[in-house]
Amino acid sequence: MSAEMTDLNFAEGRPLLVDKDGITVLLQEYVTQEHDIETAHGIVHVTMCGTPKLNRPVILTYHDIGLNHKTCFNSLFNFEDMHEITQHFSVCHVDAPGQQEGAASFPAGYMYPSMDQLAEMLPGVIQQLGLKSVLGLGIGAGAYILTRFALNHPSMVEGLVLININPCAEGWMDWAATKISGWTHALPDMVISHLFSKDEVHSNHELVETYRQHIVQDINQNNLQLFVKSYNSRRDLEIERPFPGSNTVTLKCPALLVVGDSSPAVDAVVDCNSKLDPTKTTLLKMSDCGGFPQVVQPAKLAEAFKYFVQGMGYMPAASMTRLMRSRTGSAASSSSQDGNRSRSHTNEGSRSRSHTGDGNRSRAHTGDGNRSRSHTDSNNTNSEHNTPKSMEISC
């Protein structure tokens, strides 16, 4: 990791000038407003950046445990490639109760909201801010909260970008971590093990220590312990991959699942991908990246975000990204040797029901008569063979 990571700047980004093709363009300054919004389950702190655009959703972010919206997302939103997106969309950052900068400790006996209740705070936030719909961007615990929100209120969510999503209830290791985290000195280590893989802890000392210091010094430890306990007490999302004629619980909106190839959440994300509608879901696995793609690989994440938004029908005039060019080229030459280096680089065939084991996993399958779903034996009625395969991208 470069030395810059030791001095991460968590200040709010307000881009004014950008150089595009040698021409300096003045951008509209962000109007940033902070609000403490009272909901049925308590007060939540939000930061609005920009003015909501007509007929466009607002990007709503939700951070992971041990973080707040600044330490979680500012590295991404301050990145130059994101400026084109934030010119088209305003952003609403949500801080989980008591996790914002300078938050006071909750009184003794305070019952911290459950993960379901944290999700149910969001409709009140959206209504009080006068928003119509959102495009969710969540990481870890925040990804879970946004997914629960989208399942309960599908009309409010146009799309989701979910990083390190774990759709399952806690396992026994999580249960043990919850008990141990009751010891104040053990809490930062438990959070670090959630955010970073073992390889990152050993090889990326500067980044890990930067966030360890932030967790210890800048986040209210009592409040953090309550948030961690709430996350480790989460219920299973109980989502299932839909098939024709079924009435399963699943996301109705497009979803982009993102995970680093060495992230501690990689297995959970692949599992989540296998449970979602493959016609609306894309799995992006980032190489040379662990649990913090928004910090370590902001260019790739911004690129993927832009492509996702374009796929939803927004920003049609935006420049084509490398990911889009890669996918377009792959689709145009699906019968060529390029299939071997397409979005199937994840090598997760043994871990995801959506994988066929072939190099070519494109939903088109136009060049493979032997593998095409239209050419399967009439005796094969298994729904798994008739279900479209989810798209995967590796970068």
From Swiss-Prot:
The keyword Transmembrane does not apply. Residues 345-376 have a biased composition (Basic and acidic residues). Residues 326-339 have a biased composition (Low complexity). It comes from the Eukaryota. Keywords: Developmental protein, Repeat. Signal peptide: none annotated. One of its GO terms (biological process) is pronephros development. InterPro entries: AB_hydrolase_fold, NDRG. Residues 325-395 are annotated as: Disordered. Sequence repeats lie at residues 339-348, 349-358, 359-368, 369-378. Residues 377-389 have a biased composition (Polar residues). Residues 339-378 are annotated as: 4 X 10 AA tandem repeats of G-[NS]-R-S-R-[AS]-H-T-[DGN]-[DES]. PANTHER family: N-MYC DOWNSTREAM REGULATED (PTHR11034). Belongs to the NDRG family. May be involved in pronephros development, after specification of the pronephros. This is Protein NDRG1. The lineage of its organism: Eukaryota, Metazoa, Chordata, Craniata, Vertebrata.
